[in-house]
């Protein structure tokens, strides 16, 4: 069984036991959260597609870690004009482990 959930403006295909990295969620480490924007579920009986979400479906996940991704460098410059701007950015993320898919 797998499900497609939406969080942080992205969609993720998840199964029970999967570990995913999502955009930062306001939750404590080792707490359990519910992702209720379930767009699709593939069960033994068949495929259930929501319009736009599946009614009554939830995905329970455990928060494993709150962290920051690897740093990316943004470098802007204009040739011949002595304009250089270097900036770094680390995107915050939340590491989740999928515990249960309720359909």
UniProtKB/Swiss-Prot annotation:
One Gene Ontology cellular component annotation held by this UniProt entry: cytoplasm
Keywords: Ribonucleoprotein, Ribosomal protein, RNA-binding, rRNA-binding
A Gene Ontology molecular function term of the record: rRNA binding
Family: Belongs to the bacterial ribosomal protein bL21 family.
NCBIfam families per record: L21 (TIGR00061)
Function noted in UniProt: This protein binds to 23S rRNA in the presence of protein L20.
Record-given protein name: Large ribosomal subunit protein bL21
Annotated source species: Clostridium kluyveri (strain ATCC 8527 / DSM 555 / NBRC 12016 / NCIMB 10680 / K1)
